[in-house]
Amino acid sequence: MIFDAQTHLFSRWYYAALWKQKHGSEPSDQDLHCMLKPVGLAAPPGDPAEHAALLVQQMRHHGVDRAVLFTSLPGEQATVAAACKASAGRLIGYTMVNPRAADALPLAHRDLTELGLRGIELFPAMHRFDPSDESLVYPFYELASRSCVPVFVHVGLLRVKLREKLGMACPYDMRYSDPLRLHRAAADHPKVNFILPHLGCGNLREAAMLGAACPNVHIDTSSSNQWMKLMPEPLTLERAMAVCLEAFGPNRILFGTDSSVLPRGYRYDIKESLELAMEAVELGAEDRGKIMGGNLARLLGINDE
């Protein structure tokens, strides 16, 4: 089974929310078209089921069986849940949580119990919080533990390029992007499975240290890994994979693409790059199968056999 650990819906709701943040009004279809066309994007179908059908069609074309579908802004959960419901089990949704919002905890509980979402996403730099803040964030880890769902924690470089292209503010605080800020929380919640993205996204060393210290921390391979261009020493995907195999082992690495926008669609090129990197580090067929889907299926309790 090929199971992508990270994709984004980037629904019409999402683009409308960006428009409202920028202009303070509800957009028309023409407004969205005018906003997206100059940056090379197309507005997706307004119907989540139709949008999901497009995603699944692209996944199947590239040999991908399932994918995790991220919520990309708090408030998009119902749309993501509707897309997942229409996908016949091929899309598995996560909910984005801003722990600083007053109603975040009851909404997260609703998302997991009523909407059927199966993971929690945290973006510490985006929402400006320490992921090991006991009073603010630990209740969400306890919810994840009770619900038997993983917790995704974004680390490393955070850029939402669409916001940048649209001239929108990106008031992030990357002091909270260090993977080691999660160490105390991961150690305090050994039954919670944590997932870091993008091979550490510029913090490979710190992500590897955390993975070596905490057996409940996993890492995904998603995105085109443009952050490697920022490293003071040359770094390749093959070398990054070798480091992660040493720190996490083949049981805690998850294939992902970070696929999102239309018309580009599914990032099959990222999938192919990972397959070449695994071949380069001489990974056996069993371990490749774990990384490409088996590990994530285990975390989410999915068994297609």
Language model segments and positions:
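Mid-to-C-terminal alpha-helical segments outside catalytic/metal-binding sites
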Residues: M1-H61, R66, V243, F248-L254, ...
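Active-site neighborhood of phospho(di)ester-bond hydrolases with catalytic His/Asp-centered motifs
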Residues: I2-A5, L69-F70, Y94-T95, F194-P197, ...
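Conserved, mostly hydrophobic/aromatic
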Residues: Q6, M59, V80, I120, ...
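Active-site environment of divalent metal-dependent phosphoester hydrolases
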Residues: F10-R12, P74-E76, R100-D103, L157-K161, ...
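Short, surface-exposed connector motifs at secondary-structure boundaries
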Residues: H61-R66, A88-L91, A187-F194
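Active-site gating/metal-coordination segments in enzymes
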Residues: D65-R66, S72-M174, S223
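Short, electropositive alpha-helical surface patch
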Residues: A81-A86, E206-H218, I270-E279
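Catalytic pocket-lining loop regions of alpha/beta-barrel enzymes
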Residues: R118-G119, D133-L254
